[in-house]
Amino acid sequence: MRRKDSYEYRCQCFRYLLSKDILPSSEEVNDWAVPWLVFCHYAPYDFMLREPGSPKYGIPIPMFNLVYHDCLVIPWMMEKLPEEDYMLYALLNGGAPYLIRDPAYLGIDGAFTLEEEMPWEKHLERVRIVSDFHENVGDAELVKHEILDDKGFRQRSTFANGYAVEVDLQTGSYSISKE
């Protein structure tokens, strides 16, 4: 079997699931399968898979979502670490939040034990913020992304329906607007 045949057979499986009102997903997204997927399990930035505080290679930007944002639902990690708030990346990407992320293995693939757990009510508040924003932009194309300072701490994403979010990764702040 050729690779192309494998892709075609897997897409047939996804189409079959859709025909039975079953939502196909993939652990991670492959561009050849996007037309048939409804969601994936995650698509984090590279640095999110390594231990907190590990160096970043370049400035993380929502490149994948600039192409595929309005095609499928991508859930985002919501951890708030001393050095990074992942909720800001969820907003910047217009993604859905993870309510609970139960990793198979601790210490790898973005699953690291936090010294201080966030109170459940605070976590729910953050999840609601991202959920509400995703409800507004989930079907809208991500049309523009801007880096607003030299270090890439301040970034803005703009969606086709006029919503925009600006984040400051250094201060942990964000603002949502609608034009």
Predicted feature locations:
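Active-site-proximal substrate-binding groove within the catalytic cores of carbohydrate-active enzymes
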Residues: R2-E179
